[in-house]
């Protein structure tokens, strides 16, 4: 398996099935801003609600091979082996990436257990060997990786964009970011000491960038302490 993240924004993705497994796939695709099409005679209440709200397209019938045409990615998420096989064949003929529930050997890709912290995306995969173990590891990450990591990721991204435009060497830029990561900034953010974190950013980047303006533009502003 080759680890990769896919940009599915606006791409047509097909889910065949209407139960709990299909529901999980649809939720993940919507989180990735994909254009989701669903084919199933029946839907779970949650999926039906999404269809009625217009968030997904729903064909209320059995799957036919033509459904695969134009799809970038396809999930076969039914409990019927013959349907799963039919979806697999149609996806392969259409040149789409395909994932077949409970058939890891037939899949072009596996869906990892995912932890999202805004723009920060962490995933755990076991190559299909044990989704349950992946879920346990994800839960452990969720306990250890708090919202302060997402805050730091936003901050670093906001600094990186203007810094890349400056006539500095690659090693010099890397050293600046390393000064950030080698500090206690994560702990400061975790403790609500945002003013201390902002002061450190100013100390590292203030001679190069308009740090105050950059910080004020972030959703985490104002950079004042939130804990006494």
What are the language-model segments listed below?
Residues 73-80, 84-111:
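ADP-ribose/adenylate-binding Rossmann-like module
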């Amino acid at each position: 398996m080759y680890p990769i993240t896919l940009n599915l924004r606006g791409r047509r993705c097909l889910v065949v099935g209407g139960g709990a497994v299909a529901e999980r796939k649809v939720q993940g695709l919507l989180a990735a801003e994909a254009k989701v099409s669903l084919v199933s005679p029946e839907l779970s209440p949650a999926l039906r609600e999404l269809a009625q709200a217009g968030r997904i397209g729903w064909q209320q019938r059995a799957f036919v091979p033509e459904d695969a045409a134009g799809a970038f990615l396809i999930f076969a998420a039914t409990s019927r082996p013959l349907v799963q096989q039919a979806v697999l064949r149609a996806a392969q003929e259409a040149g789409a990436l395909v994932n077949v529930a409970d058939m890891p050997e037939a899949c072009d890709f596996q869906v990892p257990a995912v932890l999202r912290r805004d723009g920060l995306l962490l995933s755990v995969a076991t190559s299909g060997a044990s989704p349950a173990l992946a879920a346990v590891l994800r839960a452990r990450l969720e306990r250890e990786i708090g919202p302060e990591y997402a805050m730091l990721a936003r901050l670093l991204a906001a600094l990186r964009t203007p810094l890349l435009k400056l006539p500095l060497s690659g090693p010099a830029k890397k050293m600046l970011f390393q000064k950030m990561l080698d500090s206690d900034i994560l702990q400061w953010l975790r403790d609500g000491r945002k003013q201390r974190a902002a002061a450190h950013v100013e100390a590292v980047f203030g001679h190069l960038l308009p740090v105050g303006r950059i910080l004020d533009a972030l959703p985490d502003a104002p950079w004042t302490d939130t804990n006494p």
